[in-house]
Amino acid sequence: MANLYSKKVRKSIRKFIRSGLNFDLLHEKHGRRLIINNIFVKLPPKYYNFAKGLDLNNILAFDSEIIQLNDLKKLIMRLPLLPDCFTDVISCHKKYLLSDAAIVNKLINSNMVSLSDIRNIIDNRIKTPVEIALLNSSLVIPGTPFSLDEVKYIFENTSAENVKELYKRIETPIHSVLYMEEKFSISPVHSSLYQVTDVDKIIYLIKKYPDDDIIDYVNGIVKSKKDFIESIITIIKDRLPDISPCLNKWISTQLPPDKLRDEFGIYFYALFEWIDIPLYIDKYLFLNITEDETKFICRYIDIYKKKSELFVNAFRWHLYYCNSMYPQKVFPVITYKQDSKEKYVVKESFKYLDNKQTMKVLLNDFKYNYAIGKYILDSSSSNEVKMDALNMLQKQVVCLENAKCFDLGNLYSVLIKFQYHPVDYVMYSDKLLDYMSKNSTFDNNDIGLLTLASFLFSTAKKGIIDINFLNTNSLWSPLMYLIDDSCKVDFTRFMMATKNIKADNINYLKNKDENINNNFEHIDNIDIYKLLDYSRIKLYGINFIKKVILANVIFEYIFTLIIIRYQKTSYNLRSFLEMLLYRCLKGFGISPKLYKNVYVNEMNICCELENLINNYVVPFKTYGILMKLLITIFNNLNGISKHSFRIRVRKSKTLL
C-alpha cells in the first residue's frame, strides 16, 4: 500500500484544514502546493500570478475585480465559445472588452452582449450591422435597414437559416425578399410580404415552404378570401401524414372545431391536439378506417392516447385481430427490471456530504478524480463536513498489487507527481518533417512496425505526439476516464475505436505512392479547447489534461501496433511483444534491461485479441500489461526506478 498523495501534499492539506479552509491564513508555500494539486475553488489576490503561471484558466478562481484585463483577453481568445461561467467576469470588464474587435467577435458568437452593447459597438465603429449579422443574426438591432447586396453577402458567407433569422429583425424591400426566394430558395418570412396581394403567389409560397410560418406575414385581405382558406385546407390534407403546425394553428382560428372535425375526420385529433374535444370510441368504426388513416394513427399514437386511452386500446385490439402490424411503435413494449447499481456522477454526488458513511463511499469511488478537491470545497456542506472530507482524502492509499492496475490508481498517483520537461523542443518540427520526408511510410511487417514504434516513442519523449494516429475519434483509450466525471472505467469508447484498428486506418502504413498527413504536434501546441468541453478543462486544469493525453496516446500507440501485428499473423507474437516493449522503453530513455521484466502469457494474450476482434470482448490482461508499462515509464520519468513493475514475457505460465 502507498499513499495517494506525497508527504508534502498531505502536510499542506492538514495545514489547510487547521486554517479553517482559509487560504489567507495559510502559509504561501502550502497554498501553492494545494493549487498545484488542484485543491482550491476561490483564491485570494496574493496567489494570482502563481496560479496564472500554472494555468491561465485559474484566473477564474479569483474575484472579477482582481482578474487583469490582458489575462482575460488571452483566455477569451483561446476558447471557441464562451461558457456561462464567464458571464460575471465579462460583465465586470465589458466596457473595456467592447473596444477590442477580436474580443467582440467572441462575445457576439457566444451571445454575451445585449442590444445596448450592440448599439455601442456600432456607434464606436467597432463592427458594422453586416459584420454582426455574419456572426450572429439574432443580435442585429431590430429595424436595421439592409440592402439586397448586403442580404446576398450574408447568405453567401453564412447559410439560409441565418438569413431567415435575419429577416425577423431587419427592414428590407419586398423585391429583395422575393429575389432571394427565387434565386436561392430562401423562405420569405419577412414583414414586407404583407405587400403581396396576389393569392396565387402566396399559395405557391406556402406550398413550397409549408414548415415555415409564412402565413404569419400574409396580408389580412388575402387571408380573408374564401379561396385562400380552401387552399390552406387542401395543403394541409395533401401534406398528410406530415403536419404543418403553423397552418394548423391559423386554420383553427378561421373555422369552428366542429367544422374542422367534420372536414378532417379522424385526423382532426392529431392535427389540432390543443383543441379540447373528446375522442369517443363509438364515433368511429375501425372497419371503415382507411389504410392511410390507420398508418396516421400509428404514427401519432401518443397524441391519440392523450385524447382517449380507451380508443387506443380498442385500436390495438383491432390491429391484433386483423393481423395488421405496422413499423410504428403501437403496442407497449414489455420491459424487464434489471438489478443494477444506479449510475451517479461526481458533480451531483458531492452537493451533499450528509454523513461520514456517505463521505467514505464517495471518496473511495472518486479518489482518482483529479477534481475531487474542488468538488469537496464547492459542495453545499458546512466547513466542518468539508474538513472531514479533506482529512479522509489526504489519508487515501493506493494498492500496489498487480490486480489494482485495472482501476488506474497506480497510474493516477504517478501522473499527479509527474512534471513534464520537453526535450529538444526548439526546431522539433523541422527535424520531424525532415525525418518524415525520408521515411514517408512504414512496411506492415515486424521490421516496419518496430521502426515506426521507435520513431513514435522517441518523439513522444519530446512531447511530440499524433492524437489522430488511428483514423477514428481521438482520445479513445480507457485512460481518458481520469478526466471523466464517472466512478467506473468506461470501455465503451475504447471498444468502438478498436473496430477501426486496421492497417488501412494507420496513416503511416499506407502504400508508398500515397501522400501521408503529418499530424504530429507538440503537446503544448495541441488545442485542448477544441478537444474537450470547457467545464472539464476548468475542473482538471490544462497541465493534468496534457499528462493524461500523453499517457493516453502512448497507450493507443502500443495497443494499435499489437492489434495490427496480430491481424497480420499471430506467429512468434512473443518475440514481437518483447521487441515492442524494448523499443518503447528505449524511446523514453529507460534502461533496456527492464523490458525483460514484463510478465506476459502469450497464449492468454492471443486468446484475448481473438475475442476482441471477433466478439468485442474487453482484453483485460493486455490492458493490464500496458498499464504496468505506462507506470514504469512515468515512474522513470519522475526519477523513480527502484520499484518498477517487473514485466517478463513467458509462453506458458500465467502470472498476470
Curated annotation (Swiss-Prot):
Key word Cytoplasm present: no
Coiled-coil region list: none
Ranges annotated as spanning the membrane: 544-564
Keywords of the record: Membrane, Transmembrane, Transmembrane helix
Subcellular locations according to the entry: Membrane
UniProt similarity note: Belongs to the chordopoxvirinae O1 family.
Name the UniProt record assigns to this protein: Protein O1 homolog
Top-level taxon: Viruses
Main localization (coarse): membrane
Organism of this sequence: Fowlpox virus (strain NVSL) (FPV)
Taxonomy of the source species: Viruses, Varidnaviria, Bamfordvirae, Nucleocytoviricota, Pokkesviricetes
InterPro entries per the UniProt record, alphabetical: Poxvirus_E2/O1 (IPR021155), Poxvirus_O1 (IPR006732)
Signal peptide range in chain numbering: none
Keyword Transmembrane in record: yes
Topology of this chain in the membrane: Single-pass membrane protein
One of the record's GO cellular component terms: membrane
